[in-house]
Amino acid sequence: MAASGSGMAQKTWELANNMQEAQSIDEIYKYDKKQQQEILAAKPWTKDHHYFKYCKISALALLKMVMHARSGGNLEVMGLMLGKVDGETMIIMDSFALPVEGTETRVNAQAAAYEYMAAYIENAKQVGRLENAIGWYHSHPGYGCWLSGIDVSTQMLNQQFQEPFVAVVIDPTRTISAGKVNLGAFRTYPKGYKPPDEGPSEYQTIPLNKIEDFGVHCKQYYALEVSYFKSSLDRKLLELLWNKYWVNTLSSSSLLTNADYTTGQVFDLSEKLEQSEAQLGRGSFMLGLETHDRKSEDKLAKATRDSCKTTIEAIHGLMSQVIKDKLFNQINIS
């Protein structure tokens, strides 16, 4: 019973995150030093600022990052990722946490973190992990996957001195609420570069107190298409992890775990609706301001989408509880 429950929980997680199995362990873990040196020497990303388009993350690296992000609660956490480059794809093989000071709005790396980083990478090479640092990750608890002004500055600095480098952002709170990993991978454009107009990206809810920071910097970076993979080795390690944690999947409830987050979402939504109502009210007394009206209606439409998203997540959490109650609590005695 325990084995079947563990396997079902693991399969559900893999399907929700579109986990793909690598064709061969050797294919994905083989490190060609000569090929990597040739790529570093050619530096194709300097000729095309949109060169890297894809980001592949191993299942084990993904789990380590999500578990680290979740352990931070409402505080931001930070870590480093090891990997390699294959054409236009950045492959993240492993990740590790950094001993940094975190707040609810930023993470601050001190000298000890940089010493730890250098020692970890050096020790990894001694045990046969030849991949170099390929990026950094940090968490945005409850406010989505995007780069703030500080994040953009940090990533620009990294790309200037440590190319190739990618920034990954994880929202552990929304991951629990939606049941799917909420993660984004980003690269910044050089200063002064104006990117071509792109189509609308996937909509995500941004809290009112973060909208300004999001809007000011959203044109300074672009998102990579993220996918996940697992090898036979990953599968064995995942089975060991799931044997330990699968019970938590059944015993926990997103309605209880994320009660504060849901309350915050409703409060944020009420502020957005009040702001939209005030703008629409002012617009009714001002003639000839069609642009103003359109902006107000656009804000109202976004607030409506946020409301639908919060409602759907709450319904999913409630349905999950009802199903578990039917399965485990209502035993028919014949």
UniProtKB/Swiss-Prot annotation:
Chain residues that bind Zn(2+): H138, H140, D151
N-acetylalanine carried by residues: A2
Segments carrying motif JAMM motif: 138-151
E.C. numbers: 3.4.-.-
UniProt xrefs under InterPro entries: CSN5_C, JAMM/MPN+_dom, JAMM_MPN+_peptidase_M67A, MPN
SMART domains from the UniProt entry: JAB_MPN
Cofactor: a divalent metal cation
Entry GO CC: chromatin; COP9 signalosome; cytoplasm; cytosol; eukaryotic translation initiation factor 3 complex; nucleoplasm; nucleus; perinuclear region of cytoplasm
Keywords, alphabetical: Acetylation, Cytoplasm, Cytoplasmic vesicle, Hydrolase, Metal-binding, Metalloprotease, Nucleus, Protease, Signalosome, Synapse, Zinc
Pfam families the UniProt entry points to: CSN5_C, JAB
Gene3D superfamilies per record: Cytidine Deaminase, domain 2
GO BP annotation list: exosomal secretion; negative regulation of apoptotic process; positive regulation of DNA-binding transcription factor activity; positive regulation of transcription by RNA polymerase II; post-translational protein modification; protein deneddylation; protein neddylation; proteolysis
Domain MPN: 55-192
Molecular function as annotated in GO: deNEDDylase activity; enzyme binding; macrophage migration inhibitory factor binding; metal ion binding; metal-dependent deubiquitinase activity; metallopeptidase activity; transcription coactivator activity; translation initiation factor activity
Record localization: Cytoplasm, Cytosol; Nucleus; Cytoplasm, Perinuclear region; Cytoplasmic vesicle, Secretory vesicle, Synaptic vesicle
Enzyme class: hydrolase
Known role: Probable protease subunit of the COP9 signalosome complex (CSN), a complex involved in various cellular and developmental processes. The CSN complex is an essential regulator of the ubiquitin (Ubl) conjugation pathway by mediating the deneddylation of the cullin subunits of the SCF-type E3 ligase complexes, leading to decrease the Ubl ligase activity of SCF-type complexes such as SCF, CSA or DDB2. The complex is also involved in phosphorylation of p53/TP53, c-jun/JUN, IkappaBalpha/NFKBIA, ITPK1 and IRF8, possibly via its association with CK2 and PKD kinases.
UniProt family annotation: Belongs to the peptidase M67A family. CSN5 subfamily.
Domain-related comment: The JAMM motif is essential for the protease activity of the CSN complex resulting in deneddylation of cullins. It constitutes the catalytic center of the complex.
Note: The CSN complex is associated with some 'Lys-63'-specific deubiquitination. Such activity is however not mediated by the core CSN complex but by the BRCC3/BRCC36 component of the BRISC complex.
Subunit composition and interactions: Component of the CSN complex, composed of COPS1/GPS1, COPS2, COPS3, COPS4, COPS5, COPS6, COPS7 (COPS7A or COPS7B), COPS8 and COPS9 isoform 1. In the complex, it probably interacts directly with COPS1, COPS2, COPS4, COPS6 and COPS7 (COPS7A or COPS7B) and COPS9 isoform 1. Interacts with COPS9 isoform 2. The CSN complex interacts with the BRISC complex. Also exists as monomeric form. Interacts with TP53, MIF, JUN, UCHL1, NCOA1, HIF1A, CDKN1B, BCL3, GFER, PGR, LHCGR, SMAD4, SMAD7, ID1, ID3, ITGB2 and TOP2A. Part of a complex consisting of RANBP9, Ran, DYRK1B and COPS5. Interacts with IFIT3.
Protein name per the record: COP9 signalosome complex subunit 5
Source organism: Homo sapiens
